[in-house]
Amino acid sequence: MTKPIEGVVIGFDFGLKRIGVAIGQTITRTATPEAIVASKDGKPDWEHISRLFEEWKPSAIVVGLPMRLNGEEQALTQPARKFGQRLSGRYQRPVYYIEEQLSSIEAEQRKTKTDQPMDDHAAQIILENWLDAL
């Protein structure tokens, strides 16, 4: 993996209804949950995403790729990859992919409120795993 420009990195947990977003820092190698972006049939709220890019000015993008436990692709793998390509094209930043096996389960275990969506926490876990691999 080529190390991106140091600074802020934005991470995504892609879903057809919701997209979790986390913000990370390559210097401290930490990430925090930031937002849950609405998505309708896989079409993200690009205005919301643009506001996040304007606010945080990330140097790179990380997208979790949903994979089966045996490492094979599943139904959401290609849509997540396409989402990453669209992000890179729109915002002119390098995109990095990381397998996101079990990130939603880990996010569920971490969260404190049981009635809240955890997509942003799943994005945090994805981003933390990517930062740990730098």
UniProtKB/Swiss-Prot annotation:
Entry's Gene Ontology cellular component terms: cytosol
BP-aspect Gene Ontology terms: rRNA 5'-end processing
Keywords of this entry: Cytoplasm, Hydrolase, Nuclease, Ribosome biogenesis
Protein name, per record: Putative pre-16S rRNA nuclease
EC assignment: 3.1.-.-
Highest taxon of source: Bacteria
Family annotation (InterPro entries): RNaseH-like_sf, YqgF, YqgF/RNaseH-like_dom, YqgF/RNaseH-like_dom_sf
Summary of the function given for this chain in its UniProt record: Could be a nuclease involved in processing of the 5'-end of pre-16S rRNA.
Recorded GO MF terms: nuclease activity
SMART domains (UniProt xref): YqgFc
Location within or outside the cell: Cytoplasm
Family: Belongs to the YqgF nuclease family.
The keyword Transport is assigned to this record: no
Signal peptide interval: none
Uppermost EC category: hydrolase
Pfam families: RuvX (PF03652)
